[in-house]
């Protein structure tokens, strides 16, 4: 009985996804044809015939973070009253899409937190980051959202995020190649205690 219900639910889910993908592809087709007409390109030539479908598929994958919640991404949370030292995930590489120009920005994110009682696996931190990088973003908000999600889900004594990224909307449109933008978000002890901040920054340098 349970297997039959799961099969029905899965079929319904696949139908909804297929319908959503079809709508997205039609919208991509209209957008792409308009773009080609404005720049003087022929959208019906051989190399471009399947481009709208590829655009729809690519953006569906790159922006799938909206379908996930931070709690789901973190997965299993462990209760541990012993571990109260800083935990750091250093230089996690990421890619995201700038909401202003729909061009990529990419780089690495370092995550630090001091547990109170709750711990999560390192893979959970990576998945949490993907929830927010796989959305239309600006770097400042991305950095803050990861910090706020950690505070909300793990209730740590503090959290700090440092994000360093290159923006293709800047590099491709202006003469500023390979420039890096750095943002940070500090919560709890990291905001209140300069020694805690200094310890985290030293770990990133080592």
UniProtKB/Swiss-Prot annotation:
Task: List the Pfam families.
Answer: GTP_cyclohydroI
- Keyword annotations from UniProtKB, A to Z: GTP-binding, Hydrolase, Metal-binding, Nucleotide-binding, One-carbon metabolism, Zinc
As recorded in UniProt, its EC number(s) are 3.5.4.16
GO MF term list: GTP binding; GTP cyclohydrolase I activity; zinc ion binding
Q: Which PROSITE patterns does the record match to this protein?
A: GTP_CYCLOHYDROL_1_1
EC class (word): hydrolase
Whether Nucleotide-binding counts among this entry's keywords is yes
Question: Binding positions for Zn(2+)?
Answer: 98, 101, 169
Share an example GO biological-process annotation for this protein: tetrahydrofolate biosynthetic process
Q: In which pathway does it act?
A: Cofactor biosynthesis; 7,8-dihydroneopterin triphosphate biosynthesis; 7,8-dihydroneopterin triphosphate from GTP: step 1/1
InterPro entries per the record? GTP-CH-I_C/QueF, GTP-CH-I_N, GTP_CycHdrlase_I, GTP_CycHdrlase_I_CS, GTP_CycHdrlase_I_dom
One of the record's GO cellular component terms: cytoplasm
Determine the domain of life of the protein's source: Bacteria
The record lists the catalysed reaction(s) as: GTP + H2O = 7,8-dihydroneopterin 3'-triphosphate + formate + H(+)
Q: What NCBIfam families does its record include?
A: folE (TIGR00063), PRK09347.1-2 (NF006825), PRK09347.1-3 (NF006826)
Q: Which HAMAP family match?
A: FolE
The subunit structure is: Toroid-shaped homodecamer, composed of two pentamers of five dimers.
Family membership? Belongs to the GTP cyclohydrolase I family.
Q: Any idea what this protein is called?
A: GTP cyclohydrolase 1
**Species, as recorded:** Helicobacter hepaticus (strain ATCC 51449 / 3B1)
The UniProt gene name for this protein comes to folE
């Amino acid at each position: 009985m349970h297997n039959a219900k799961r099969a029905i639910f899965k079929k319904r889910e696949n139908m909804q996804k297929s319908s959503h993908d079809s709508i997205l592809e039609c919208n991509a087709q209209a957008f792409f044809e308009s773009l080609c007409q404005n720049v003087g390109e022929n959208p019906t030539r051989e190399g471009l015939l399947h481009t709208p479908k590829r655009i729809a598929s690519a953006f569906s994958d790159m922006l799938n973070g909206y379908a996930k919640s931070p709690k789901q991404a973190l997965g299993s949370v462990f209760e541990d009253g012993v571990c109260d030292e800083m935990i750091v995930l250093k230089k996690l590489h990421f890619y995201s899409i700038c909401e202003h120009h729909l061009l990529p920005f990419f780089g690495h994110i370092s995550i630090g937190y001091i547990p109170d009682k709750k711990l999560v696996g390192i893979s959970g931190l990576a998945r949490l980051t993907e929830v927010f990088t796989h959305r239309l973003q600006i770097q400042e908000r991305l950095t803050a959202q990861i910090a706020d999600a950690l505070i909300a889900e793990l209730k740590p004594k503090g959290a700090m995020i440092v994000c360093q990224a290159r923006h293709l909307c800047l590099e491709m449109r202006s003469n500023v190649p390979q420039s890096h933008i750095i943002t940070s978000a500090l919560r709890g002890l990291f905001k209140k205690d300069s020694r805690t901040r200094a310890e985290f920054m030293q770990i990133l340098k080592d």
